[in-house]
Protein backbone atom coordinates (compact mmCIF):
# COMPACT_ATOMS: atom_id res chain seq x y z
CA UNK A 1 0.00 0.00 0.00
CA UNK A 2 2.76 2.44 0.78
CA UNK A 3 5.52 3.02 -1.73
CA UNK A 4 8.35 5.55 -1.93
CA UNK A 5 7.48 8.85 -3.53
CA UNK A 6 7.93 9.04 -7.30
CA UNK A 7 10.65 11.35 -8.68
CA UNK A 8 8.09 13.83 -10.03
CA UNK A 9 6.61 14.39 -6.58
CA UNK A 10 7.20 17.91 -5.24
CA UNK A 11 8.32 16.42 -1.92
CA UNK A 12 10.58 13.78 -3.43
CA UNK A 13 14.18 13.69 -2.16
CA UNK A 14 16.96 11.16 -2.28
CA UNK A 15 16.28 10.26 1.35
CA UNK A 16 12.51 9.92 1.03
CA UNK A 17 12.73 6.86 -1.17
CA UNK A 18 13.74 4.69 1.74
CA UNK A 19 10.88 5.87 3.90
CA UNK A 20 8.26 3.45 2.62
CA UNK A 21 7.05 2.00 5.87
CA UNK A 22 9.22 -0.73 7.34
CA UNK A 23 11.90 -0.73 4.66
CA UNK A 24 14.74 0.34 6.94
CA UNK A 25 14.23 -2.61 9.28
CA UNK A 26 13.68 -5.03 6.40
CA UNK A 27 16.81 -3.97 4.54
CA UNK A 28 18.91 -4.50 7.65
CA UNK A 29 17.54 -8.05 7.89
CA UNK A 30 18.21 -8.60 4.17
CA UNK A 31 21.82 -7.47 4.58
CA UNK A 32 22.29 -10.00 7.38
CA UNK A 33 20.80 -12.70 5.18
CA UNK A 34 23.21 -11.76 2.38
CA UNK A 35 26.09 -12.28 4.81
CA UNK A 36 24.86 -15.76 5.71
CA UNK A 37 23.81 -17.47 2.48
CA UNK A 38 26.27 -19.87 0.83
CA UNK A 39 27.49 -18.63 -2.55
CA UNK A 40 27.85 -20.78 -5.66
CA UNK A 41 31.29 -21.03 -7.20
CA UNK A 42 31.94 -18.97 -10.35
CA UNK A 43 31.00 -19.06 -13.15
CA UNK A 44 27.60 -20.05 -11.72
CA UNK A 45 25.83 -16.76 -10.96
CA UNK A 46 24.53 -15.74 -7.56
CA UNK A 47 20.74 -15.56 -7.97
CA UNK A 48 18.73 -12.91 -6.13
CA UNK A 49 14.92 -12.87 -6.53
CA UNK A 50 12.73 -9.81 -5.97
CA UNK A 51 9.17 -11.07 -5.54
CA UNK A 52 6.63 -8.35 -6.35
CA UNK A 53 8.85 -5.69 -7.90
CA UNK A 54 6.13 -3.29 -9.16
CA UNK A 55 7.86 -0.24 -10.70
CA UNK A 56 11.15 -1.02 -8.98
CA UNK A 57 11.37 1.94 -6.59
CA UNK A 58 11.03 -0.26 -3.51
CA UNK A 59 13.71 -2.57 -4.93
CA UNK A 60 16.52 -0.07 -5.50
CA UNK A 61 17.97 0.24 -2.03
CA UNK A 62 17.40 -3.35 -0.88
CA UNK A 63 18.92 -4.85 -4.03
CA UNK A 64 21.85 -2.42 -3.97
CA UNK A 65 22.64 -3.16 -0.33
CA UNK A 66 22.29 -6.92 -0.74
CA UNK A 67 24.50 -6.91 -3.82
CA UNK A 68 27.13 -4.82 -2.02
CA UNK A 69 27.25 -7.40 0.79
CA UNK A 70 27.42 -10.30 -1.64
CA UNK A 71 30.14 -8.58 -3.66
CA UNK A 72 32.36 -8.24 -0.62
CA UNK A 73 32.19 -12.00 -0.23
CA UNK A 74 33.21 -12.96 -3.76
CA UNK A 75 35.21 -11.93 -6.82
CA UNK A 76 34.63 -8.62 -8.54
CA UNK A 77 33.56 -10.40 -11.73
CA UNK A 78 31.32 -13.05 -10.15
CA UNK A 79 27.95 -12.53 -11.86
CA UNK A 80 24.95 -11.61 -9.71
CA UNK A 81 21.64 -12.19 -11.49
CA UNK A 82 18.59 -10.36 -10.13
CA UNK A 83 15.19 -11.71 -11.15
CA UNK A 84 12.42 -9.15 -10.62
CA UNK A 85 9.00 -10.81 -10.59
CA UNK A 86 5.44 -9.52 -10.71
CA UNK A 87 2.08 -10.33 -12.27
CA UNK A 88 1.74 -10.15 -16.08
CA UNK A 89 -0.18 -6.84 -15.91
CA UNK A 90 2.69 -5.11 -14.13
CA UNK A 91 4.34 -2.21 -15.97
CA UNK A 92 7.69 -3.85 -16.64
CA UNK A 93 8.63 -0.95 -18.89
CA UNK A 94 8.52 1.35 -15.86
CA UNK A 95 10.59 -1.19 -13.92
CA UNK A 96 13.33 -1.30 -16.54
CA UNK A 97 13.35 2.49 -16.84
CA UNK A 98 13.78 2.73 -13.07
CA UNK A 99 16.70 0.33 -13.16
CA UNK A 100 18.30 2.10 -16.11
CA UNK A 101 17.70 5.71 -15.12
CA UNK A 102 17.76 5.93 -11.34
CA UNK A 103 21.17 6.79 -9.88
CA UNK A 104 20.50 4.42 -6.97
CA UNK A 105 20.10 1.43 -9.28
CA UNK A 106 22.44 -1.47 -8.61
CA UNK A 107 23.18 -1.60 -12.35
CA UNK A 108 25.12 1.66 -11.96
CA UNK A 109 27.00 0.45 -8.89
CA UNK A 110 27.99 -3.12 -9.75
CA UNK A 111 29.09 -3.87 -13.33
CA UNK A 112 28.85 -7.62 -12.76
CA UNK A 113 25.15 -7.46 -11.82
CA UNK A 114 22.51 -8.42 -14.36
CA UNK A 115 18.76 -7.95 -14.50
CA UNK A 116 15.91 -10.16 -15.63
CA UNK A 117 12.13 -10.10 -15.15
CA UNK A 118 9.40 -12.71 -14.79
CA UNK A 119 5.77 -11.82 -15.45
CA UNK A 120 4.02 -14.55 -13.48
CA UNK A 121 2.26 -14.74 -10.13
CA UNK A 122 4.46 -15.72 -7.22
CA UNK A 123 1.65 -17.88 -5.84
CA UNK A 124 3.06 -20.60 -8.09
CA UNK A 125 6.60 -21.75 -8.82
CA UNK A 126 8.23 -19.22 -11.14
CA UNK A 127 11.95 -20.03 -10.86
CA UNK A 128 13.77 -23.37 -11.14
CA UNK A 129 14.04 -25.48 -8.03
CA UNK A 130 17.07 -24.97 -5.77
CA UNK A 131 18.43 -21.99 -7.72
CA UNK A 132 17.66 -18.87 -5.65
CA UNK A 133 20.35 -17.90 -3.15
CA UNK A 134 18.65 -14.82 -1.71
CA UNK A 135 15.02 -13.69 -1.92
CA UNK A 136 13.24 -10.45 -1.10
CA UNK A 137 9.59 -9.38 -1.03
CA UNK A 138 8.21 -6.09 0.31
CA UNK A 139 4.64 -4.80 0.30
CA UNK A 140 3.54 -7.57 -2.07
CA UNK A 141 2.21 -10.66 -0.30
CA UNK A 142 -0.68 -8.74 1.26
CA UNK A 143 -2.29 -8.72 -2.22
CA UNK A 144 -4.48 -11.77 -2.75
CA UNK A 145 -4.14 -13.91 -5.85
CA UNK A 146 -7.83 -13.39 -6.62
CA UNK A 147 -10.94 -11.68 -5.27
CA UNK A 148 -12.82 -14.51 -3.56
CA UNK A 149 -16.23 -12.79 -3.50
CA UNK A 150 -18.03 -9.46 -3.72
CA UNK A 151 -19.39 -7.45 -0.80
CA UNK A 152 -21.20 -4.16 -1.04
CA UNK A 153 -20.73 -2.22 2.16
CA UNK A 154 -17.09 -1.09 1.98
CA UNK A 155 -14.07 -1.03 -0.30
CA UNK A 156 -12.03 -3.26 2.06
CA UNK A 157 -13.20 -6.52 3.58
CA UNK A 158 -11.64 -5.72 6.96
CA UNK A 159 -14.25 -2.97 7.39
CA UNK A 160 -17.18 -4.91 5.93
CA UNK A 161 -20.00 -6.28 8.06
CA UNK A 162 -20.37 -9.23 5.66
CA UNK A 163 -19.21 -12.18 7.75
CA UNK A 164 -19.25 -14.60 4.83
CA UNK A 165 -17.02 -12.30 2.80
CA UNK A 166 -14.60 -11.87 5.68
CA UNK A 167 -14.38 -15.65 6.05
CA UNK A 168 -13.81 -16.13 2.31
CA UNK A 169 -11.02 -13.55 2.33
CA UNK A 170 -9.41 -15.19 5.36
CA UNK A 171 -9.47 -18.57 3.62
CA UNK A 172 -7.93 -17.10 0.47
CA UNK A 173 -5.27 -15.30 2.50
CA UNK A 174 -4.32 -18.55 4.24
CA UNK A 175 -4.09 -20.44 0.95
CA UNK A 176 -2.05 -17.71 -0.74
CA UNK A 177 0.47 -17.45 2.10
CA UNK A 178 0.83 -21.23 2.19
CA UNK A 179 1.50 -21.32 -1.55
CA UNK A 180 3.90 -18.39 -1.42
CA UNK A 181 6.15 -19.95 1.21
CA UNK A 182 5.87 -23.47 -0.21
CA UNK A 183 6.98 -22.46 -3.70
CA UNK A 184 9.77 -20.28 -2.32
CA UNK A 185 10.90 -23.34 -0.39
CA UNK A 186 11.23 -25.19 -3.67
CA UNK A 187 13.03 -22.33 -5.43
CA UNK A 188 15.59 -21.53 -2.73
CA UNK A 189 18.96 -23.21 -2.95
CA UNK A 190 20.12 -25.16 0.11
CA UNK A 191 20.64 -22.71 2.99
CA UNK A 192 19.21 -19.90 0.86
CA UNK A 193 17.25 -17.16 2.62
CA UNK A 194 14.12 -15.09 1.96
CA UNK A 195 13.19 -11.81 3.67
CA UNK A 196 9.52 -10.77 3.57
CA UNK A 197 7.93 -7.47 4.61
CA UNK A 198 4.14 -7.49 4.52
CA UNK A 199 1.00 -6.15 6.17
CA UNK A 200 0.14 -7.47 9.62
CA UNK A 201 -2.66 -6.84 12.09
CA UNK A 202 -2.37 -5.26 15.51
CA UNK A 203 -3.17 -6.92 18.83
CA UNK A 204 -6.87 -6.25 18.25
CA UNK A 205 -6.79 -7.87 14.81
CA UNK A 206 -7.06 -4.48 13.08
CA UNK A 207 -5.38 -4.18 9.66
CA UNK A 208 -5.17 -0.39 10.01
CA UNK A 209 -5.43 2.31 7.31
CA UNK A 210 -9.00 2.91 8.50
CA UNK A 211 -9.19 6.63 7.73
CA UNK A 212 -7.71 6.17 4.25
CA UNK A 213 -9.98 3.26 3.38
CA UNK A 214 -13.04 5.01 4.80
CA UNK A 215 -12.18 8.09 2.73
CA UNK A 216 -11.95 5.98 -0.42
CA UNK A 217 -15.23 4.20 0.34
CA UNK A 218 -17.02 7.49 1.02
CA UNK A 219 -15.66 9.10 -2.14
CA UNK A 220 -16.77 6.11 -4.23
CA UNK A 221 -20.26 6.33 -2.77
CA UNK A 222 -20.35 10.00 -3.76
CA UNK A 223 -19.30 9.15 -7.31
CA UNK A 224 -22.07 6.57 -7.57
CA UNK A 225 -24.61 9.04 -6.18
CA UNK A 226 -23.47 11.67 -8.69
CA UNK A 227 -23.70 9.25 -11.61
CA UNK A 228 -20.03 8.84 -12.50
CA UNK A 229 -20.09 5.22 -11.29
CA UNK A 230 -22.75 2.61 -11.84
CA UNK A 231 -23.95 0.70 -8.81
CA UNK A 232 -22.73 -2.65 -10.16
CA UNK A 233 -19.29 -1.11 -10.72
CA UNK A 234 -19.25 0.22 -7.19
CA UNK A 235 -20.07 -3.23 -5.83
CA UNK A 236 -17.12 -4.72 -7.74
CA UNK A 237 -14.69 -2.17 -6.36
CA UNK A 238 -12.63 -3.78 -3.65
CA UNK A 239 -9.01 -3.60 -2.54
CA UNK A 240 -8.03 -7.27 -2.12
CA UNK A 241 -5.34 -6.90 0.52
CA UNK A 242 -5.07 -8.58 3.90
CA UNK A 243 -3.08 -8.21 7.07
CA UNK A 244 -1.88 -11.38 8.75
CA UNK A 245 -1.28 -12.15 12.40
CA UNK A 246 1.81 -13.94 13.64
CA UNK A 247 -0.35 -17.05 14.01
CA UNK A 248 -1.42 -16.74 10.36
CA UNK A 249 2.19 -16.37 9.23
CA UNK A 250 3.33 -19.41 11.19
CA UNK A 251 0.43 -21.62 10.08
CA UNK A 252 2.02 -23.17 6.95
CA UNK A 253 4.99 -24.33 9.02
CA UNK A 254 2.88 -26.29 11.53
CA UNK A 255 3.18 -28.80 13.04
CA UNK A 256 6.76 -29.71 12.08
CA UNK A 257 8.11 -26.16 11.89
CA UNK A 258 9.02 -26.47 8.22
CA UNK A 259 7.46 -26.53 4.76
CA UNK A 260 9.34 -27.61 1.62
CA UNK A 261 12.51 -27.48 3.72
CA UNK A 262 11.84 -23.87 4.72
CA UNK A 263 11.86 -22.73 8.36
CA UNK A 264 11.31 -19.42 10.13
CA UNK A 265 14.56 -17.87 11.33
CA UNK A 266 13.05 -14.53 12.39
CA UNK A 267 9.50 -13.20 12.67
CA UNK A 268 8.26 -9.98 14.24
CA UNK A 269 5.27 -7.68 13.92
CA UNK A 270 5.44 -3.99 14.71
CA UNK A 271 3.59 -0.70 14.36
CA UNK A 272 4.97 1.34 11.47
CA UNK A 273 5.40 5.11 11.48
CA UNK A 274 3.16 7.32 9.37
CA UNK A 275 5.80 9.60 7.87
CA UNK A 276 3.14 11.92 6.42
CA UNK A 277 1.76 12.47 9.91
CA UNK A 278 5.27 13.19 11.18
CA UNK A 279 5.62 15.77 8.43
CA UNK A 280 2.23 17.27 9.28
CA UNK A 281 3.22 17.67 12.93
CA UNK A 282 6.07 19.86 11.74
CA UNK A 283 4.35 22.02 9.14
CA UNK A 284 0.65 21.67 10.14
CA UNK A 285 -0.25 21.66 6.44
CA UNK A 286 -3.45 19.62 6.38
CA UNK A 287 -3.85 19.96 2.62
CA UNK A 288 -0.38 18.51 2.04
CA UNK A 289 -1.13 15.65 4.45
CA UNK A 290 -4.30 14.75 2.57
CA UNK A 291 -2.64 15.15 -0.82
CA UNK A 292 0.29 12.91 0.11
CA UNK A 293 -1.88 10.04 1.28
CA UNK A 294 -4.20 10.45 -1.70
CA UNK A 295 -1.25 10.37 -4.11
CA UNK A 296 -0.04 7.14 -2.55
CA UNK A 297 -3.52 5.66 -2.79
CA UNK A 298 -3.67 6.68 -6.45
CA UNK A 299 -0.39 4.91 -7.20
CA UNK A 300 -0.87 1.80 -5.08
CA UNK A 301 -4.63 1.20 -4.84
CA UNK A 302 -6.59 3.03 -7.51
CA UNK A 303 -5.37 0.85 -10.44
CA UNK A 304 -7.20 -2.07 -8.82
CA UNK A 305 -10.39 -0.01 -8.63
CA UNK A 306 -10.09 1.10 -12.26
CA UNK A 307 -10.26 -2.54 -13.35
CA UNK A 308 -13.78 -2.68 -11.87
CA UNK A 309 -15.08 -0.10 -14.37
CA UNK A 310 -17.15 -1.66 -17.15
CA UNK A 311 -14.41 -0.78 -19.64
CA UNK A 312 -11.51 -1.44 -17.30
CA UNK A 313 -8.40 0.62 -17.94
CA UNK A 314 -9.77 1.50 -21.40
CA UNK A 315 -13.00 2.92 -19.98
CA UNK A 316 -13.46 6.52 -21.21
CA UNK A 317 -14.28 7.58 -17.64
CA UNK A 318 -11.05 6.14 -16.19
CA UNK A 319 -9.03 9.35 -16.07
CA UNK A 320 -11.93 11.39 -14.66
CA UNK A 321 -12.68 8.64 -12.15
CA UNK A 322 -9.11 8.56 -10.83
CA UNK A 323 -8.71 12.34 -10.77
CA UNK A 324 -11.97 12.91 -8.91
CA UNK A 325 -11.25 10.09 -6.48
CA UNK A 326 -7.80 11.40 -5.62
CA UNK A 327 -9.13 14.92 -5.02
CA UNK A 328 -12.01 13.66 -2.89
CA UNK A 329 -9.79 11.41 -0.77
CA UNK A 330 -7.31 14.25 -0.27
CA UNK A 331 -10.10 16.57 0.84
CA UNK A 332 -11.58 14.08 3.28
CA UNK A 333 -8.22 13.36 4.91
CA UNK A 334 -7.26 17.04 5.04
CA UNK A 335 -10.51 17.94 6.78
CA UNK A 336 -9.65 15.89 9.87
CA UNK A 337 -5.98 14.82 9.89
CA UNK A 338 -5.03 11.94 12.15
CA UNK A 339 -2.14 9.46 12.12
CA UNK A 340 -2.59 6.38 9.97
CA UNK A 341 -2.33 3.22 12.02
CA UNK A 342 -0.53 0.38 10.26
CA UNK A 343 1.07 -2.86 11.40
CA UNK A 344 3.78 -4.72 9.53
CA UNK A 345 5.31 -8.18 9.71
CA UNK A 346 8.96 -8.86 8.97
CA UNK A 347 10.17 -12.41 8.44
CA UNK A 348 13.40 -14.13 7.49
CA UNK A 349 12.97 -17.68 6.19
CA UNK A 350 15.82 -20.14 5.62
CA UNK A 351 16.06 -23.31 3.53
CA UNK A 352 17.60 -26.37 5.11
CA UNK A 353 20.83 -27.92 3.82
Stretches found by the model and what they are:
Residues 130, 176-183, 187, 252:
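Short, conserved SAM-binding segment of the class I
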Residues 134:
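Short, Asp-centered acidic motifs that coordinate Mg2+ and/or phosphate
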Residues 137-176, 198-235:
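Mobile active-site "lid"/loop adjacent to the S-adenosyl-L-methionine
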Residues 22-25, 172-176, 241-245:
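Soluble or luminal CAZymes and related metallo-dependent hydrolases
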Residues 1-130, 143-161, 196, 201-202, ...:
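N-terminal charged/capping segments associated with class I S-adenosyl-L-methionine
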Residues 190-314:
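Substrate-binding/catalytic lobe of Class I Rossmann-like enzymes that use SAM or dcSAM, i.e.
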Residues 149, 188-190:
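Helix-to-beta-strand junctions that scaffold the AdoMet/dcAdoMet cofactor pocket
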Amino acid sequence: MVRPEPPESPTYTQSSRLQAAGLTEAIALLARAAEQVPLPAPPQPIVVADYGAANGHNSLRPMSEAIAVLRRRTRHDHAILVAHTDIPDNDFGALFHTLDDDPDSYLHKDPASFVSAIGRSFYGQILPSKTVNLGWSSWATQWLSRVPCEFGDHVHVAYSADGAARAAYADQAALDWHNFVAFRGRELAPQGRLVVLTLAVDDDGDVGFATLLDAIAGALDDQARDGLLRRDELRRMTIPTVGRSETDLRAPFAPSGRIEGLTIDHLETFAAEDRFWARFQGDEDADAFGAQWAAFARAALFPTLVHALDGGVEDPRAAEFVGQLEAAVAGRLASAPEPMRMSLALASLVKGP
